Amino acid sequence: MPNHDFLHSLNEQQQKAVLHTEGPLLLLAGAGTGKTKVLTSRIANIIHQNLASPQNILAVTFTNKAAKEMQERVHNLVSSYGLNIGTFHSMAARILRDQIEHLNLGLNSRFTIISQDDQLRLIKDIVKLKNIDTKKYAPKLIHIVISRWKDQGLLPNKLSSSDTNLPLQRVAKLVYEEYQQNLLISNVVDFGDLLLYNNELFIKNPDILKHYQERYRYILIDEYQDTNVVQYLWARMLASLSKNICCVGDDDQSIYGWRGAEVGNILRFEKDFLNATIIKLEQNYRSTLPILAAASNVINNNKNRHGKTLWTDKESGEKIKIISCWNDKEEARYIAAEIARLVREGRYSAGNIAILVRAGFQTRSFEEAFINSAMPYKIIGGLRFYERMEIRDVLAYIRIALNQNDNLALERIINVPKRAIGAVTLNKIKLYAIEKNISNFAAIKEMLEDGEIKTKSYETLKDLVTKISNWHERFSFDAPINVTKAILDDSGYLEMLQEEKTEEALGRIENINEMLRAIAEFNDIHDFIEHSSLVMENESLETSYGGSVTIMTLHGAKGLEFDVVFLPGWEEGVFPSQRSLDEEGEKGLEEERRIAYVGITRAKKELYITHAESRKIFYEIVRSYPSRFLAEIPEEIIIRTSSIKKYDSFYKF
């Protein structure tokens, strides 16, 4: 019998989901319905009933933060040593390292994972080598096309004529072939390769697939509505033997179609897994009745969805406030003043209030309004730690020390600090490497030995090669923190920053020191490199909101909650986005409506929705009309008003 500690705090539907232990289960979890609690209780129950050991359970999430939270919650319920909880990418990387030789690609288990920035740099190099017109075919667009193909599970040799109908696609295919070859030569992979190669591995090696099918007897996938094709295929293959797969998601919160997420994955679950059980979690523990009514009435206008209706046993709360403003500046002034009033009256702290915008261009007017009102605020969406220049530089030094075939890492650090290695010499090295089909580092070594480099760069390159070789050897016996400090000193990188003596340089040194603190927690430098790569790709919001109002996009707010939420810019063309309507038609409209649903359900107690009669978009004043989504909210739960002059004076703090 299950431990009833897992059940006593769960409602009836949540209990059903926890006690379901055999066969496929689709858990349709509406916003704020306690899905994480159900997931962790379900894992704990499986372990407690001895249906599987922790090592035989695989739980997959989209972010490191979610994986860590799930791990901690399960551990608080039962002993769960050996439980496999992680992101799609981390789990796929683990399998690939163990089985990479079976793919016969030339990769070995010490491959590194390159960042988005390095991916783009490589594509730019290929575009330049092939003399492709970057005005017609921007490298960023080519990168997007290649990434989308990988999300669909398509390697260059699997692209059909329908995949290359457009001129951009035909150019992207040429670049894609060269791009993959460069990755293999450098013994690196990108994030798209991790799952793509996993699926290739399973298809070509049924015995390996069976091994993992037998190992992972219970599979749980969180945020299933956000899976792309290659993630979906990976999960389906792993679960096809035991059929004990539990997919948790909410088709009404599928808002990442632009990056490859396929809402159809959750809609066709019953076809993929016959005799599947579907359980709906509809009791909301977050929001008030009017907020839930607004969300439900908006999303009910979507046709392609599993029907469900959120409800709560909370007493009715504040009505939804819909405010009409003269223009976008007045809208920002009104919101800043209203927030100031709520905080001044002691009803809410600034940290429990959020402004959620549809598009980045909307934030500037709020910055100005908050500066004028002396209201503390924070715009979420700046550079993350591992995306900062100095951190990427140090990571590149570590990568080239570990993997001397990593062309991208070498290219990044070869003149940082400045070493006077000119463009002519660099180009000569690249051409030599291409001709010999070897890495750039190997090319430098051969050219130095053969006297191919006779410029003043000779001594500099010889010194760099020696240092990289020494660092490589030292990593085999010394602690990662010690070797990294040596790299910073020997390379002159730290000295370069110290000599700048600017506030910016001091900030960069502080960041490097923080990075060293992170490295000190790892015994194996490869584990740190993999950790940093996965964090860069999946890093979720770690910000403490303190006493600042949060300004962020609706996409960024998914999974968060605030006492008070302001939703500005609810006008046709802004929200729903005109681009989505033009490019995707009805499909785009339904995704926009799901974004609206996500925004509404972030609010716990009060919700404000504003729209402007005119808006400045890209330097042009445009007449605006209220969003069609506003007409989908019942009048009986709305208070309509207009912004007025009194909000021109601000409460000071």
From Swiss-Prot:
Pfam families: UvrD-helicase, UvrD_C. Keywords: ATP-binding, DNA damage, DNA repair, DNA replication, DNA-binding, Helicase, Hydrolase, Isomerase, Nucleotide-binding. InterPro entries: ATP-dep_DNA_helicase_PcrA (IPR005751), DExx_box_DNA_helicase_dom_sf (IPR013986), DNA_helicase_UvrD-like_C (IPR014017), DNA_helicase_UvrD/REP (IPR000212), P-loop_NTPase (IPR027417), UvrD-like_ATP-bd (IPR014016). GO terms for cellular component: cytosol; DNA helicase complex. This is Probable DNA helicase II homolog. It comes from Rickettsia bellii (strain RML369-C). Signal peptide: none annotated. The gene is uvrD. Residues 8-288 form the UvrD-like helicase ATP-binding domain.
